[in-house]
Amino acid sequence: MTRFSRAAAAIVALLLAVPMAGLLPRTPSSRTVAEAGEAYLDFLKQDSLYLRMKLGLPIDRLPDVSLAKEEADARFAARWLTRLGEVRASDLDEDETLSLDILRRQLGAVRDAPHFHGLTFPVTPYASPFGLVNRAFSTFAIPDEGAARRYVALLRQMPAFVGAVRAELTAQAARGIRIPRDELAIAVPFVASLAGDAQTSPYAVVVERLATLPPSAATAFRADVAAVIEKDVDPPLRSLVDWLGGEYRAEAPEAVGLGQYPGGPEYYAWLVRLHTTMDVAPAQVHQIGIERVAAIDTEMKRVRERLGFAGTKPEFKAFLKKDARLFPRSPEEIGERLMGHIRRIEPKVDAFFLRRPKAPYGVRRLEPQLEPGQTFGYYNPPTAAEPIGYYYFNGSSLADRSLLNAAALIYHELVPGHHFQINLAYENRTIPPFRRETTDTAYTEGWGEYASALAGEMGMYEDPYDLYGRLSMEMFITLRLVVDTGMNALGWPRAKAVALMRENLMETDTQIETESLRYSCDIPGQALAYKMGALEILRLREKARTALGPRFDIRRFHEAVLGRGSLPMTTLERHIDWFIAQEKKR
């Protein structure tokens, strides 16, 4: 990866000059904001498995999913919000003001969380803490006998953890809150994939991970792990699977969506604000989605006409499903195609960005047990154990896995998408540490979607099939605004959402089934952040372009968006206003 020029470095220094002043607290209000940021980061380090893995901190306990823990966290947040309420905004510089905004929003979410406890299901593939728990075990470094003992000690916590998850599900059920029956068809196999004997359990340790242990110690360790799995870990997992698939399922609802549960409508409205980081209501988001879907549909029709296709949209979809060029012959080919698109965009980056992240990147296949519950995959930032940022792709069901939108997808995930956005912030040591380790969904996913669209301005969609793939991905992301709000706030049956998705999307029926459950039963509201965030970033770009006229430089705008880390959309607009004022002074 090439280094950026000295001139570009000087530009970055100018952009960062004022925010850097925030590194040294200047006033009592400055000190309060700095202390709150440090306390919040310490709070996150204590319990976040993701953060502990990323920072290379010891993993010595599994997550606490109880209401008591949420209430304790809320008390911590309330104390700091009280102190932050005494801060005088006029005493803060630009970067301190950003920190204050972020702390108030994120601590506010922690404070409010107990009010909605019991409305998230701990065994659905996206929301479940099992995903991070599995990764903690699978990436647990075992270089010596002390680490081996710590692994066994952590494994011994699994029965209590599984029991706590079951207790949460039982308490939910007592309130009339159960996982919908359709979602159980995914959740039960997901939990079942965690069970297994000493040879098949995902918590077993292959001998290759023990290369630095003395042979006798490795043998003893594997025997200990096998005994714990078969005696303590596997039985409660199998019991949970049997219960979910039997007694629990018998009373599970047919309907989907948060709106059916006590407190569900209020929780969903809160989630919409939380994930979009804007003061918008579900009905507003729904209408934005309807309007944008119509506009994208018109653009897709133009591309079909450009290709000389005279048939209908469903006929073109059927035509594409028969084009062998669009389907991989192996999981490895998926990775090769994705990285091929990355190699095409790399030479164009410097015309649009002042900096590149230092962290390397690549693609890998998802863990097979996670593939049934995930339509595509996810980006995993570098950690101490794995210093490369990887996009984990779904390598299953190859006959149904079209690569039509592979270019648009990987530009969203890696370059110039998540890998740029996450690592440019993490590598920028002028950003307060707590802000390098926290994100807002609308900013993170909004940037990913914006980056995918930006790739078109960088010349990546000259092939009409790549362009159609980009538009199909945009349709996929935008239709979420309609169906997520429809199922959770407007009382839509899942069948209505699925029918609309089948009419407008290129995805297979299997993918549509998975996605519709993700929106309605697993992580409602989260999918709204992608398009809402992207639309807001684009609006702010046009605001800056209009205000600056010929002085507008897209590289400097991108530096302003990315240079201070993840920001709520309302905070980002205030920061872009500050950026515009600074640019006018140049």
Per-segment meaning from a language model:
Residues 17-586:
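N-terminal maturation segment of proteins
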Residues 9-19:
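Hydrophobic membrane-insertion alpha-helices, especially the h-region
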Residues 1-11:
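Bacterial N-terminal signal peptides that target proteins for export
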